[in-house]
């Protein structure tokens, strides 16, 4: 039998890749074929932000990417019609990014996909298995969150 580390690595990679494939398939079948997974997750970050809009800086922090990368991605989403940019009245150097109606539709579709995915997983588990799974994933998430923060410092 494989050792724990090897088995865990295979499961993490396979699970991550399976979720990405499912998301890509969902995007294509729902008419969002012109969105990449990264763009979809950026829309999700914009949607979770301030209703008045998010700044490029806050999006970069949220997504753990550089300002230039977010700027390029936001500009692509503007061209595709998913977000709009507006200069801040208080600080003309700052830009706020908001979802358009098309962006809100795509973000709702993505949220619905995640709801259905979680429901399907939960349906196959007993209550004690759900509890164990949550505890394990919470620890896993805490570990990766700490690693992410320590690597940024």
Would you name each region that the model predicts?
Residues 1-33, 37:
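N-terminal leader segment of winged-helix/HTH proteins
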Residues 1-3, 128-153:
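C-terminal regulatory/oligomerization modules of transcriptional regulators
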Residues 12-15, 19-26, 63, 106-122, ...:
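Alpha-helical linker/hinge and terminal dimerization helices associated
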Residues 24-66:
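N-terminal helix-turn-helix DNA-binding core of bacterial DNA-binding proteins
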Residues 33-36, 52, 69-72, 76, ...:
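Short glycine/proline-centered loop/turn elements that form peptide/ligand docking sites
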Residues 56-57, 68, 75, 95:
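Residues within helix-turn-helix
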Residues 75-135:
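Charged, amphipathic alpha-helical coiled-coil/dimerization segments
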């Amino acid at each position: 039998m494989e050792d724990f580390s090897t088995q865990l690595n295979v499961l993490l990679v396979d699970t991550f890749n399976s979720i990405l494939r499912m998301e890509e398939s969902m995007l294509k079948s729902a008419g969002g074929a012109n969105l990449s997974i990264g763009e979809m997750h950026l829309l999700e970050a914009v949607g979770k932000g301030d209703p008045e809009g998010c700044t490029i800086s806050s999006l970069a922090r949220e997504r753990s990417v550089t300002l230039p990368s977010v700027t390029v991605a936001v500009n692509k989403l503007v061209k595709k019609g998913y977000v709009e940019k507006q200069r801040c009245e208080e600080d003309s150097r700052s830009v706020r990014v908001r979802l358009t109606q098309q962006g809100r539709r795509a973000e709702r579709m993505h949220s619905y996909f995640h709801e259905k995915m979680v429901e399907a997983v939960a349906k196959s588990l007993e209550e004690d298995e759900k509890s164990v799974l949550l505890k394990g994933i919470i620890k896993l998430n805490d570990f990766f969150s700490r690693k992410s923060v320590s690597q940024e410092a």
